[in-house]
Design a protein with these regions (language model features):
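Feature activates predominantly on carbohydrate-active enzymes
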Residues: 89, 93-235, 248-252, 285
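Active-site groove signature of glycoside hydrolases
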Residues: 242-268, 291-300
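Lectin-like carbohydrate-binding module/patch detector with strong preference for beta-trefoil
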Residues: 602-739
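Bacterial Sec-dependent N-terminal signal peptides
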Residues: 1-25
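Acidic, His- and aromatic-enriched active-site or binding-groove loops in soluble protein domains
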Residues: 200, 204-205, 242-251, 273-275, ...
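Substrate-binding groove of N-acetylhexosamine-processing glycoside hydrolases
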Residues: 26-29, 34-35, 278-304, 310-605
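Short, acidic/polar
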Residues: 159-170, 235-245, 309, 335, ...
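Acidic, contiguous N-terminal accessory segments
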Residues: 19-105, 131-139
Length: 739
C-alpha cells in the first residue's frame, strides 16, 4: 500500500521543535514517506559505512556533497547483498530500483535493492539536505514504470552536446532512466545510417554514453533505416557493423525506428519483424550486457493503423523487443482504453512515445504549462514511457520534471503541484516571475494535430471575459484598471528575468519569448490608454497611442528565435495566444470603430483589413500549398501543391499572413521554417537578401468568395496563379477571369 504519512505528536510543555525544521517536498513523489516529530540538522561531516562495496556513482555523489571524516554522523550505504545494510534488509523494497532511506540524528541509511536504487536513495537524501534543518524521515520507494524518460525525436534544431550532458544530470536528480537518441536531423541516425560516425562525433557519443551511465540513464542509440533499407544480406551486415561500432563507443541500448516512412516495401510488418529478429539474435543476444531492442513501428498510432500490420508485427516479432506507440493519433495523451487496444494487437505492453511537450509542429509556442491528460491507471500496462521534448532543452524541463513525477508514482501524481515544484526547482531565485511567464505560455495555438491546453493567462481571462461579456468591450474603468495591473505584472516579470544572471542556459532559450511578452504588455497598456483617450475626447492622444502600438507590434514581429547561421527553424515567438492575442485583435477593431464613428480619420493610419492576420491554409482545386523542402537556409525553391494534409509536419502547409500597418499590404510566411514568399512566388531569400516590403509584400483582394494575391507595383503588379506544380506570378489584368 502506498503511504504518504505525517506523524503528528502532542507536545508537552517545555518541549518544542526547531522553528526552522520543515517537511520537504521530494521529487519524484515517493511511494511511502513517514516524517517524525524529531528535528534533524544537516551534519557538517559524515562517516561512511559500506563504502567498500556500495555503488560507485552513489558514493561519488555523497563525497561530492559531504565532508567525510571518522567523527561525522554515520551514513550506512549499500545494496541488498552488502553486509553493511544487512540489518535493514526487511525494509528494502523488493522492487527494481527501489531503496530504503532513513534520516535520524543517530544514523543515515541508504539501502538500495540494486545499484540504481542506492543511487536514487542518495538523490533523495541530497534533496533533503538542500535544507539546513528538517524533520527526521523514513522513505520506502520504487518506480511504477521501469523504463521512463525522454526520446529526442523531434524535427528541428537538434540538442547540442552540452544540452544533452545537462539533461543527464537532470534525469539523474529526478530519477529518469532512459534517453533515446533519435534526432531527425542527425544524418548518421537517418540518411547515413549504414556509415560510422566521424571521429569527432564518435567521441561525443562515447562521452554521452559515459555520462548517462554515471547518472543511471540508459543511453539508447536509435537507428532509422526505414527510408531506404533493403531486406538483403548486405544491409543486414551493414546494420550489424553499425551497431558494433556504437557498442565500441560504450552504447549498450539500441532502438530501430520505422516511423514517418513511405516506401511500400520498407513499411511491411513481415520485413521489419524478420530484420529486427535477426538483430536480436545476431547482436543483442550475443552481447550479455545489451538491453532488449526498442522499435518504433510505421503505424505508430491508432489513426494510422490498418487491419493487419500491428497484429502481424506483434505475432512475428521477438517478444523481448519493445514496440513504441503514440496513442490514438500522432499527438495524444494516453488513457486506459488506448493501452488495452494496442496491447491486445501487439501481444505485449506498448512502449509509450508521448508527443508532449514537443513543439516542432507549433514551433512559435513554448509549452510551459502543467503536464496533464494521461490516465493514472496505466502503470501496469506500459512497457516504458518516454516523452518527446521541445528542441529547447532547458525549457522542456518544466514538463520533464512532471513526466518523472508521473512515471515514478502514477496514482499520486498531481499535475498542478508537480508544475509548481518544477518552476520552483528550475528558477528558485525568480519563481514568481517565472510562474507569470509559464502562465502565458501554455496553449499550442491552432495546429494541425488538434492538441490544445487549457489554463493560459488565467487571471487575465477572468477580467477579459467580464469586460467582453458584460459590456461588449465598452469602457469600464474598474475592469480596465484590473487588466492594466495584470499587464504590469507581465512587463515586470519579463524585466526581472531578462536582467537576471540566474540559470543562464534556460533564460537564453526563453529570451525571445520574454521580449515578446514584454512588448505585448506594453501594447495592451497603450490600448487601455486609447480607451482613456476616447473617454477624454483626446483625438491626438488616441492616434499617438495607436501609432506607438503599431511600432511595438512591428518590433514584436521582428523578434526571431534561433536566428543563427545553419538554424533549421527560426520562429517568431507567440506568447499568450489563447486569451491575450485575440483580446488585442478584438479591442483594436472595437476602438478603431469607435474612433471612426466620432472623428474624420486618415486611411494611411487606419487601412481597411481585407484578411485578419493569422495562420491560414492556402488551397486551390482541393489541394494544399505546401513548403515541401522546408529549411530556413534553403533558397530558390517554390512551394508545391499536395493532395493530402501533412499530418507529420503540418506547419509545412500553414501560412502566417499579417498586414503591415505602414504599407497596408500583407506579408506571407511559412510556419514551418519562417521563410517568406517573394514577388515571384519562390523562397529566394537568404542572409544576403533581406525582407523588402516594397518587393515582398502583397495586396490581397476578395472577389467572388475567393482571395487574390497581387504583388506590389514595384514588383510588377502581378497576380499569383496556380498550375500543376505550384504558384507563379502573371500579369494581373482581369482579376475576375483569373479567379
Amino acid at each position: 500500500m502506498k503511504i504518504q504519512k505525517i506523524i503528528v505528536f502532542v507536545m508537552s510543555v517545555g518541549y518544542c521543535l526547531c522553528a526552522n525544521s520543515q517537511i520537504v517536498s521530494i521529487s519524484p513523489n515517493p511511494q511511502s514517506v513517514e516524517w517524525s516529530e524529531e528535528s534533524f540538522k544537516k551534519p557538517e561531516t559524515i562517516k561512511l559505512v559500506g563504502d567498500k562495496s556500495a555503488d560507485i556513482d552513489a558514493l561519488n555523489l555523497i563525497k561530492h556533497n559531504f565532508s567525510v571524516s571518522d567523527k561525522g554522523l554515520k551514513l550506512v550505504i549499500g545494496e541488498r547483498e552488502d553486509s553493511s545494510v544487512k540489518p535493514y534488509l526487511k525494509y528494502i523494497p523488493d522492487k527494481e530500483e527501489g531503496y530504503y532511506l532513513k534520516v535520524s540524528n543517530d544514523v543515515i541509511v541508504v539501502a538500495g535493492n540494486d545499484v540504481a536504487g542506492t543511487f536514487y536513495g542518495v538523490q533523495t537524501l541530497l534533496q533533503l539536505m538542500q535544507n539546513e534543518s528538517f524533520y527526521c524521515v523514513t522513505v520506502s520507494d520504487y518506480p511504477d514504470v521501469l523504463q521512463r524518460g525522454v526520446v529526442e525525436g523531434f524535427y528541428g534544431n537538434p540538442w547540442s552536446h552540452t544540452d544533452r550532458l545537462r539533461q543527464f544530470d537532470f534525469y539523474g536528480k529526478n530519477k529518469l532512466n532512459v534517453y533515446i537518441y533519435g534526432p531527425k536531423d542527425d544524418p548518421y541516425h537517418r540518411e547515413y545510417w549504414r556509415k560510422e560516425y566521424p571521429e569527432d562525433k564518435a567521441k561525443e557519443i562515447a562521452q554521452l554514453a559515459e555520462v548517462a551511465s554515471r547518472n543511471k540513464v540508459h543511453f539508447v542509440w536509435a537507428m532509422h533505416p526505414g527510408q531506404d533499407i533493403k531486406w538483403n544480406e548486405e544491409d543486414r551486415k551493414s546494420s550489424l557493423n553499425k551497431l558494433e561500432s556504437m557498442y565500441k563507443l560504450g552504447v549498450r541500448s539500441f532502438a530501430v525506428f520505422f516511423d514517418d516512412i513511405f516506401g511500400e516495401e520498407q513499411s511491411k510488418a513481415d520485413g521489419q519483424a524478420d530484420y529486427l529478429n535477426f538483430l536480436q539474435r545476431e547482436f543483442v543476444e550475443k552481447h550479455h550486457d545489451v538491453a532488449p531492442l526498442i522499435m518504433c513501428p510505421t503505424e505508430y498510432n491508432k489513426g494510422w493503423a490498418g487491419k493487419t500490420y500491428l497484429p502481424l508485427l506483434g505475432d512475428r516479432l521477438d517478444k523481448n523487443i519493445h514496440i513504441m506507440w503514440t496513442g490514438n493519433s500522432v499527438v495524444d495523451m494516453i488513457n486506459d482504453g488506448d493501452m488495452d487496444w494496442i496491447n491486445q494487437r501487439i501481444d505485449r505492453k506498448a512502449y509509450i512515445w508521448l508527443n508532449y511537450p514537443v513543439n516542432d509542429y507549433c514551433i512559435d509556442h513554448l509549452l510551459m504549462g502543467p503536464t496533464y491528460g494521461n490516465d493514472k491507471t496505466i502503470a501496469s500496462k506500459v512497457g516504458g514511457f518516454v516523452s518527446n521534448p521541445m528542441e529547447y532543452a532547458e525549457a522542456s524541463k518544466v514538463s520533464l520534471y512532471s513526466i518523472a513525477d508521473y512515471t515514478w508514482n502514477m496514482e499520486q501524481y498531481d499535475e498542478n503541484k508537480s508544475w509548481e515544484n518544477a518552476m520552483k526547482n528550475l528558477m528558485s531565485d525568480h519563481y514568481e516571475a517565472f510562474r507569470v511567464f509559464c502562465e502565458h505560455n501554455i496553449d499550442l495555438g491552432a495546429n494541425g494535430h488538434g492538441l490544445r491546453r487549457d489554463g493560459e493567462s488565467p487571471n487575465l481571462r477572468i477580467f477579459i471575459d467580464e469586460l467582453e461579456g458584460k459590456n461588449g468591450l465598452a469602457y469600464n474603468k474598474l475592469l480596465l484598471d484590473s487588466i492594466n495591473k495584470e499587464f504590469d505584472r507581465m512587463i515586470e516579470s519579463a524585466d526581472e528575468l531578462l536582467s537576471s544572471n540566474s540559470e543562464p542556459e534556460l533564460l537564453s532559450e526563453i529570451k525571445p519569448w520574454l521580449k515578446v511578452m514584454k512588448l505585448i504588455g506594453q501594447r495592451v497598456k497603450l490600448l487601455i490608454d486609447m480607451y482613456e483617450a476616447l473617454n477624454d475626447k483626446d483625438e491626438k492622444r488616441f492616434v499617438d497611442d495607436y501609432e506607438s502600438s503599431i511600432k511595438l507590434e512591428q518590433e514584436q514581429k521582428g523578434i526571431i528565435s534561433r536566428n543563427f547561421e545553419g538554424s533549421i527553424k527560426k520562429p517568431n515567438p507567440a506568447v499568450a495566444s489563447e486569451v491575450v492575442s485575440p483580446f488585442i485583435t478584438r479591442t483594436v477593431r472595437y476602438l478603431i470603430r469607435l474612433y471612426k464613428e466620432n472623428y474624420t480619420y486618415r486611411t494611411d493610419i487606419f487601412p481597411v483589413e481585407v484578411l485578419e492576420g493569422g495562420k491560414y491554409y492556402i488551397k486551390c482545386n482541393g489541394m494544399w500549398l505546401t513548403n515541401a523542402n522546408a529549411d530556413a537556409n534553403r533558397v530558390g525553391d517554390f512551394p508545391v501543391w499536395k493532395k493530402e494534409k501533412d499530418m507529420i509536419n503540418p506547419q509545412r502547409q500553414e501560412w502566417i499572413v499579417s498586414m503591415e500597418a505602414l504599407t497596408g499590404r500583407y506579408k506571407i510566411v511559412n510556419a514551418q521554417d519562417g521563410r517568406f514568399l517573394t514577388d515571384g512566388g519562390a523562397f529566394r531569400v537568404s542572409e544576403n537578401v533581406k525582407y523588402d516590403n516594397e518587393l515582398h509584400s502583397f495586396d490581397i483582394y476578395r472577389i467572388n468568395g475567393k482571395y487574390a494575391i497581387v504583388t506590389t507595383s514595384k514588383a510588377g503588379g502581378m497576380i499569383f496563379t496556380a498550375d500543376d506544380s505550384g504558384i507563379k506570378a502573371e500579369k494581373s489584368d482581369g482579376l475576375n477571369e483569373k479567379l
